[in-house]
A protein has these predicted regions:
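Rossmann-like S-adenosyl-L-methionine
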Residues: 179-269
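Class I Rossmann-like S-adenosyl-L-methionine
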Residues: 1-205, 238-241, 259
């Protein structure tokens, strides 16, 4: 993997810390589209791991620097720490590439970045042993979970927030019985027409991507439409009008249309 992947990771992270969403940042960073699937997966892994653990990473960083400015140098350090502590990246690679990134932009801070990351490498075992997943959850949220569900469930919720989510795929009703979709998509049928699989590789490479036979929709998002279908099961769906407000990204809208409802979907432009 070339330094280009870290360059692009830095560009994306700079945008995110300036209020741009992850998806918007991917569009704005010109070189993102030029990466192959493997490098795109690597960049996403860096950024999403960093975002999920950003509170913890900044707490660690605060032990090594007196002040954490909102600039690209801090983001380079964040990317370096993410690779050293949470990803299977050789330490020397994470440190050297981070130093080269800052050298291109602010040469006088190269030794600083190099020194901080090398010290983190030396302290790696101690830092990992002191990691607490719940630190990545805002305290008020974790306290509410603990009060409502108890400490064990609250901890499980925190653990789940750090995991890569599965990819859920909803198959069109008239297509579902015509093919073994669990095998075709390398997943498993959860319920109804929902197939769940590990979120790896490019969606465009999945079976029948261009044929309009399925769409991406989380299993939980499909439940409200299932309830509506059960409620109106004795009525001609074509004569039932559904108004969906806040319709993006469109999974429930597509599901309603697939069930022959007359749908009006609204969202901000």
């Amino acid at each position: 993997m070339s330094i280009c992947t870290r360059e692009i990771s830095l560009e994306i992270l700079n945008l995110i810390y300036n209020g741009i969403t992850f998806d918007e940042a991917l569009v704005k960073v010109e070189n993102w589209a030029k990466l192959d699937a493997r490098d795109k997966s690597f960049v996403k892994m860096i950024i999403l791991t960093l975002i999920r653990r950003n509170i913890e990473i900044d707490l660690i960083l605060s032990n090594y620097v007196k002040y954490i400015p909102r600039d690209f140098v801090t983001n380079i350090l964040r990317i370096g720490i993410t690779q050293i502590l949470f990803l299977r990246i050789p330490e020397y690679s994470a440190v050297n590439i981070s130093a080269n990134l800052v050298k291109k932009r602010k040469k006088n801070l190269t030794n600083f970045v190099n020194a901080v990351l090398r010290q983190i490498c030396r302290d790696k075992e101690k830092l990992i042993s002191n990691l607490h997943i719940q630190k990545n959850i805002p305290q008020w949220i974790f306290s509410n979970w603990k009060k409502s569900f108890g400490i064990d469930l609250a901890q499980k919720f925190a653990n789940q927030c750090l995991k890569e989510p599965y990819l859920d795929i909803n198959i069109k009703k008239n297509e579902f019985s015509l093919k073994n979709w669990s095998n075709a998509l390398n997943g498993k049928n959860l319920f109804g027409e929902i197939v769940r699989k590990k979120n790896t590789g490019s969606i465009e490479d999945l079976s029948n991507y261009s044929d309009g036979k399925w769409w991406i929709q989380s299993a939980s998002a499909s439940v409200p439409v299932n309830i509506i279908c059960n409620y109106f099961e004795k009525i001609n769906y074509c004569k039932t009008n559904i108004l969906e407000v806040g319709a993006a990204p469109g999974g429930k809208t597509t599901q309603l249309c697939d069930n022959k409802f007359n749908v009006t979907a609204l969202d901000i432009s």
